[in-house]
Amino acid sequence: MTTNPNQRESLTAISQRRLQAVKSKSIYVLPNAFTAAALFSAFYGIIAAMNSDFLSAAIAVFFSMLFDGMDGRVARLTHTQSEFGVQMDSLADGVSFGIAPGLIVYEYTLKGLGKLGWAIAFVYALCALLRLARFNCNVGVVSKNYFQGLPSPAAAALVCGFVWLCVEGHLPDFAQPYTSEIAAVVTLYAGLTMVSNAPFFSGKSYAVVKTIPFWVIAVGTLLFIVISSNTSLSIFVLFCLYALSGYAYGFYCYWTGRPNPIQADIARSLAQQQAEQAEGDVH
């Protein structure tokens, strides 16, 4: 049995489409694999905390941050963004930056505060989930230049950074008897700041440039040296500064009379919705 040229071309086209479908499915696995890796790191951190290996537990959450920062970039680079990936990433973030840090800090030191300790850990986890839900609802409302409230990865870094700091013995001697109380304050601050309207710089407005100024290289090198010399202390201090920056910028806007970018975006969105509703009522 022989096939004519038209049939051969048709079979070739079908084969190419099937091959393209297989490639597409394999590429879609790539960004979700990073999301799964972030979730695995957080799960490992929980298991490590249950086994009193708090150093590994804290560092595991930072690995979750690393993988979480890569999945979206990989999806954009490979043009494989999907609604499934968005939802999976959000659910994984809830575990990685909400549940895991709350359990780790509770097992490490908040347990000593009794019921108050687990209540604080729960408030943190709840605030992280509320933060993620609000972020999903406000896509397209709030400018990408700012985060509305402290991002959940930064909050997790603040909480787990404190655990890491304490495990390595960098907490001052006079503060060590109050480790549980300090952890409670840090955890509550991180949780409540996530659901605040404080504007935090996202860094998404900076485009990739071909040339880098010398001062940027110098500052980057200095930061690398400082972090390398005392990783846990440097990371905790950096995230403390970032966690305070949103309130500082909000106060600056209030003091100078400039509009708060988050409040301005929300007001603009509400005005647009009211205008569209009014236009619909007219028609």
Stretches found by the model and what they are:
Residues 44-59, 99-119, 162-182, 228-233:
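Helix-coil boundary and interhelical linker segments in multi-pass alpha-helical membrane proteins
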Residues 1-69, 249, 283:
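Topogenic membrane-insertion module of multi-pass membrane proteins
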Residues 28-35, 77-132, 162:
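Multi-pass membrane catalytic core of lipid/isoprenoid biosynthesis enzymes
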Residues 23-34, 41-54, 59, 112-139, ...:
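"…together with the soluble PPM/PP2C metallo-phosphatase catalytic core" -> "…together
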Residues 1-19, 144-283:
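C-terminal membrane-associated helical module and adjoining short loops/tails
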Residues 73-82, 129-144, 149, 195-204:
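C-terminal ends of transmembrane helices
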Residues 43-46, 63, 101, 126-129, ...:
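Alpha-helical transmembrane segments of polytopic integral membrane proteins
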Residues 34-37, 57-64, 120-127, 155, ...:
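Hydrophobic alpha-helical transmembrane segments of polytopic
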